[in-house]
Structures are given as structure tokens and as C-alpha cells.
């Protein structure tokens, strides 16, 4: 077992992983989360092979893997919204901390997650 030690201030940003049953479902969820400013971007990886336990059996499915960039403060809303939009009973929604990145990318990420000024 190990732990990550941050020197200085930790990054408040996350990479959120999700799988979806189809490209159409993944696109619908990502576009909704973008419109609601819960994510800054989403990347889709088509046709990953997933193996998992479900109802006492080992299952295999082709799924779409989605990487989304968001923030710690938006994760609960994002997770709740994915649960509302997703077709799975138990959708995969995992958050990984971003420990570092290029300054320009992190500034862009922050700007995308701020409310739109009218």
C-alpha cells in the first residue's frame, strides 16, 4: 500500500473514467455534461473489451471507454448526472486525481469549468 504525497497545493482537477454501452450513449452523456459545464472535455475510445462480474457470472462486453476532465468540486454533480443519463444499473464512474499538467492546459481546463458570464 502506498500514498501519494503532494508538495505544495494539490490540483483540484480530475480525470473521470466511464464506460458506456455504445458510442451513441457515450456521445449523449458527454455532450450533456459539456453543456451543463460539469466537464471541460471528453475523449471516447471505441470498442474496448470489458470483462467483469455481474449477477454471479463473468461477463464480456464491447464498450466505449470515456475519459473526462473535471474538478473535485463538480464530481458529485457529475456522478449524479451520469447516473440519471446512463443505461446501466451500476455505471462505472471513477475519479483519478490530476497530479500535474502543463500550465496552459490547466488554465484552459479551469476556464471551461467556470460558469458562463452573460
Regions found by a protein language model. Name each.
Residues 2-118:
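Positively charged, small/polar-rich N-terminal and surface patches that mediate targeting and assembly
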Amino acid at each position: 500500500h502506498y500514498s501519494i504525497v503532494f508538495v505544495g497545493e494539490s490540483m483540484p482537477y480530475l480525470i473521470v473514467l466511464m464506460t458506456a454501452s455504445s458510442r451513441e450513449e457515450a456521445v449523449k452523456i458527454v455532450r450533456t455534461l459539456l453543456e451543463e459545464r460539469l466537464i471541460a472535455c471528453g475523449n471516447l475510445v471505441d470498442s474496448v473489451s470489458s470483462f467483469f462480474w455481474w449477477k454471479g457470472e463473468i461477463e464480456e462486453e464491447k464498450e466505449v471507454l470515456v475519459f473526462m476532465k473535471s474538478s473535485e468540486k463538480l464530481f458529485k454533480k457529475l456522478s449524479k448526472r451520469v447516473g440519471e443519463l446512463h443505461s446501466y444499473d451500476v455505471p462505472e464512474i471513477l475519479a483519478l486525481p490530476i497530479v500535474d499538467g502543463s500550465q496552459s492546459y490547466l488554465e484552459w481546463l479551469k476556464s471551461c469549468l467556470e460558469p458562463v458570464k452573460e
